[in-house]
């Protein structure tokens, strides 16, 4: 509801929310090759922003929606992927303890088209277990806080966070100075 709150506070301008889905390692390529663009906010403004994006991203699906929905999409994606990383790390621990080849398990599980290959490598692309960076830790903890504020017990998200702290004890996200995830 941040965008709605800002629109109520600053009535002389229209504020929209356009979540970015960029990885830190490939942000330029990710931006150039977006597979969808989501714009949330008041209608006249979202139409104007959609028209601006359409000039550059002629084949990319562009979705206009309410700002709360657009904000929620960002949290859904990041928290789902964080959950997938934590699940993969826990399953890797189980495989290691049972003397099972985790990579073969993943290879054969991916024959099931319902399971996508992203975020299943452990260690991940940074050579470490779990998730770090600025987005997943920040967004997961923000959603835990929000869920608690609206009376929902975020037990699954708590489990995701505990597993990440277990497999990534160095907490590298805390070293990211000047980013919201590292600030009190």
Q: Where do the protein language model's features map onto the residues?
A:
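NAD(P)-dependent Rossmann-like dehydrogenase/reductase catalytic/cofactor-binding core
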Residues: 51, 96-184
């Amino acid at each position: 509801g941040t965008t709605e709150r800002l629109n109520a506070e600053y009535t002389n301008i229209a504020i929209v929310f356009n979540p970015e889905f960029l990885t830190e390692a490939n942000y330029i390529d990710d931006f150039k090759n977006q597979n969808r663009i989501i714009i949330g906010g008041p209608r006249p403004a979202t139409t104007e922003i959609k028209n601006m994006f359409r000039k550059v991203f002629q084949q990319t699906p562009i979705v206009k929606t309410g700002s709360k929905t657009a904000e929620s999409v960002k949290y859904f994606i990041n928290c789902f992927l964080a959950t997938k990383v934590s699940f993969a790390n826990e399953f890797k621990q189980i495989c290691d303890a049972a003397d099972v080849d985790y990579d073969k398990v993943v290879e054969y599980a991916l024959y099931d088209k319902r399971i996508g290959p992203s975020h299943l490598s452990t260690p991940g692309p940074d050579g470490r277990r779990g998730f770090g960076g600025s987005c997943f830790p920040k967004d997961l903890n923000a959603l835990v806080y929000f869920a608690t504020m609206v009376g929902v017990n975020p037990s699954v998200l708590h489990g995701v966070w505990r597993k990440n702290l277990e497999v990534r004890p160095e907490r590298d996200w805390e070293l990211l100075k000047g980013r919201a995830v590292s600030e009190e």
